[in-house]
UniProtKB/Swiss-Prot annotation:
This is Small ribosomal subunit protein uS3. Residues 39-109 form the KH type-2 domain. Belongs to the universal ribosomal protein uS3 family. Pfam families: KH_2, Ribosomal_S3_C. Residues 231-240 have a biased composition (Basic and acidic residues).
Length: 240
């Protein structure tokens, strides 16, 4: 079950929180859900070069409060706050209302320990036609420097322009998908290449969260019982 279900949805209410927090009349739920989807799409399209990791939405009466988690807060804020103002005006025009929109920009402290930013980095490199094995190896090195407890990367599609699509994955450290208290960050991105679309999935294990404690507890290192998947991956990568 832990291998199939979405890692974030599986842990909602345990170690993960909902990305949209609001209450509304049942008749307005479809309308507000569509608004949330439009807001996220607009922000991701407008700030596609700002390293957006997460977008949180809260509604209070007629006020919408947005929390934008980004690796480059300066790009979002702009000179003198002009970027925030343009974003707010664009959202008001998109929603077609004069509701008050408040934008909070939160900096991601460690971009290499964030699954969304890691998947975005891999996608950008693949779109530049860099060998996927080299990209995955670089991503693993960046994750190791960020001192995460485990990372798993999966790339699917016509890798390196191969005729037959396939799936390759590599894991370093522990990624316990069945453990509900495990703080696992997950992201899915696509890369548009000349050969077609590549799917990228990233799981990052940051430690275990005990109820009543906010910080993740470092998991004890496990003894490897067999040849690691990364070694197998590197052995096959000698030819390409």
């Amino acid at each position: 079950m832990g291998q199939k279900i979405h890692p974030v949805g599986f842990r909602l209410g345990i170690t993960k929180d909902h990305k949209s927090c609001w209450y509304a009349d049942p008749k307005r739920y479809p309308e507000l859900l569509q608004e949330d989807h439009k807001i996220r799409q607009y922000i991701e399209k407008t700030l596609n070069n700002a390293g957006i990791s997460d977008i949180r939405i809260e509604r209070k009466a007629e006020q919408i409060e947005l929390g934008i988690h980004t690796a480059r807060p300066g790009v979002v804020v702009g000179r003198g706050g002009s970027g925030i103002e343009q974003l707010r005006e664009g959202l008001q025009k998109l929603l077609g209302s004069a509701r008050q929109i408040r934008v909070n920009v939160i900096e991601v402290p460690n971009a290499d320990a964030d699954a969304a930013l890691m998947a975005e980095y891999i996608g950008q490199q693949l779109e530049r036609r860099v060998s996927f094995r080299r990209v995955v190896r670089q991503a693993l090195q960046r994750a190791e420097r960020a001192e995460v407890k485990g990372i798993k990367i999966q790339v699917s599609g016509r890798l390196n322009g191969a005729e037959i699509a396939r799936t390759e994955w590599v894991r370093e450290g522990r990624v316990p998908l069945h453990t509900l208290r495990a703080d696992i960050d997950y992201a899915y991105r696509t890369a548009l290449t000349t050969y077609g679309i590549l799917g990228i999935k990233v799981w990052i294990f940051k430690g275990e969260v005990i109820p009543g404690q906010e910080a993740a507890i470092v998991a004890p290192p496990s003894q490897p019982r067999r040849k690691s998947r990364r070694q197998q991956f590197d052995d096959r990568s000698q030819d390409g």
